[in-house]
Amino acid sequence: MTTIRSRKAKGRRLQDWVRDSLRGLFLTLTDDDVKVAIMGERGTDVKLSKQAKKLFPYDIECKNAEGWTKIYNAYDQADGHGDDHPVVFIKMNRRKPLAIIDAKHFMKLNNVGFITDPIKVEYLDERKR
């Protein structure tokens, strides 16, 4: 059983990874352009300035949970099909389809025109520490 503190820490690690990855992706942005929301704050989990929104026009919600097993199993299946980048399309009744891709690949797709390495941050899972 996990504690509220450990669940919040796990969520915070993912938010920090996204923030740091975006800062590494767009070197023209300052620390003030990409910030992590305070726990419990309304709105997106990673706050982007107007300048950052011009470069990365997304509203970011971070969810770090163990309940994604079926999605990861589908992703592993797609990954085993060949050498290309895997993508999983998911859909529920009365909901629009979603595409699931690797986060680093997503960052690289948004790095078009930049010469920096988009991902300079490794995501550290507490179990690997």
Give the location of each predicted region.
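Catalytic phosphate/metal-binding cores of nucleic-acid and nucleotide-processing enzymes, i.e., regions
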Residues: M1-R129
